[in-house]
Amino acid sequence: MARESCASETVSAAAVLFAWGANSYGQLGLGHKEDVFLPQQLSDFCQAGCIKSVTGGGGHSAVVTDGGDLFVCGLNKDGQLGLGHTEEVLRFTICKPLRGCPIRQVACGWDFTIMLTEKGQVLSCGSNAFGQLGVPHGPRKCVVPQAIECLREKVVCVAAGLRHALATTATGSVFQWGTGLASSGRRLCPGQNLPLFLTAKEPSRVTGLENSTAVCAVAGSDHSASLTDTGELYVWGRNKHGQLASRAVFLPLPQRIEAHYFQDEKVTAVWSGWTHLVAKTETGKVFTWGRADYGQLGRRLEPPEAQKPVEQDSSLAFQGPQNSVPSPLHCLTGATEISCGSEHNLAVIRDKCCSWGWNEHGMCGDGTESNVWTPTPVQALPPSPSRLLLVGCGAGHSLAVCQLPAHPVPCQDLKVTCPLPDDTENTESQGAVDRDRLEGETISDLNPDRTRNGGGGCESETVQ
């Protein structure tokens, strides 16, 4: 999923959209359903307006224009495109039911979509099997965006995970709905009464954040995170892969990640994949932590047998200390845009796009299906003087917006002459990773490119 850009970062109308990666449902908007391993330019897309944000979900994509129009494509089995039907859409199509209702931000979940209007109202469509639409007595699916009436406060940010969603209000509160975290919580916290916001099918205020003012929130598959106006990061939910930087296997209430993990700097932005997190601090440093077996963290870790033993309470054990501790990724210092898919990532640094992580469907854009272990330039995107402006991720696909020069340079056989600092050759190590194994997290009846789903990101403009 993607960080939603604010209106002040609107991309010029001359910008063009590129898409690549998993495409089993037409989520790339290219008019077919074949995976694409190199970025492909979408012709004549969205000429009437500027592109403000790009993002994706389990098998669908969404683009918001400067004028507030929403364009969608891809999987639509549960009505997640909001078009009034359930047929797949292979090219970006304007969401007509929202005409006259300008959209500010979109968050794509696994099989549902959350929209935020310019007036601060939240809409939803798609699957409601786990209460993720925030309409407790509504139908099991909704094919047209509907307002979440019980969320009466003005909202400034929305996020969508696998089976839950969040909204941050103008007053700094966070609301959560959808039962995506409830099953893990009951299993990992036996005998405990879970807070209402973990089990609610309508927006419920997240308790434990009363003494802070939230500016945004993000969602993973089984976890959530919230960033405050003072640069503090709170996390809650499942911690199987160390993504909560805690010894607990499950955090039912928000817990602050200590500032020393970020070298005592304030956090200004956070993004979430399915089981990993990325944060940026006030000086532009980028930190990653969480699941790492597909290269999600952009750095190679020592194998467990090579790590020094660390004393831990076995009842509170979580995956080894290397991946559970936020660590700086020096080659991304100063990145202006970052987006997390389910297990892959995109970043914009010095007007160039870099990718790393899971690459089974070519979503890293290097022309292969081998995982990418360190941030690596996407060479097939247009070179200088073109500028990479926006990036966005779905579960297993990628989107990018480039500003092309007046006379575009051909994209074929492009070479990057100045590799990024810390950029190292990515060697294939798939023998050590079974790409079809999801450690018990597989969701039945899903095609491979829908087996992971990212959670999106947010950036604070108020941290001082």
Swiss-Prot record:
It comes from the Eukaryota. One of its GO terms (biological process) is negative regulation of protein secretion. InterPro entries: RCC1/BLIP-II, Reg_chr_condens, Ub_ligase/GEF_domain. It is found in: Cytoplasm; Nucleus. Residues 422-464 are annotated as: Disordered. Keywords: Cytoplasm, Guanine-nucleotide releasing factor, Nucleus, Phosphoprotein, Repeat. GO terms for cellular component: cytoplasm; cytosol; nucleoplasm; nucleus. PROSITE patterns: RCC1_2, RCC1_3. This is Secretion-regulating guanine nucleotide exchange factor. Its main location: cytoplasm. Signal peptide: none annotated. The modification Phosphoserine is found at residue 429. PANTHER family: OS09G0560450 PROTEIN, REGULATOR OF CHROMOSOME CONDENSATION. It comes from Mus musculus. Interacts with SEC5. The interaction occurs only in the presence of magnesium or manganese and is stimulated by dCTP or GTP. Probable guanine nucleotide exchange factor (GEF), which may be involved in the secretion process. RCC1 repeats lie at residues 15-67, 68-119, 120-171, 172-230, 231-283, 284-351, 352-402. One of its GO terms (molecular function) is guanyl-nucleotide exchange factor activity.
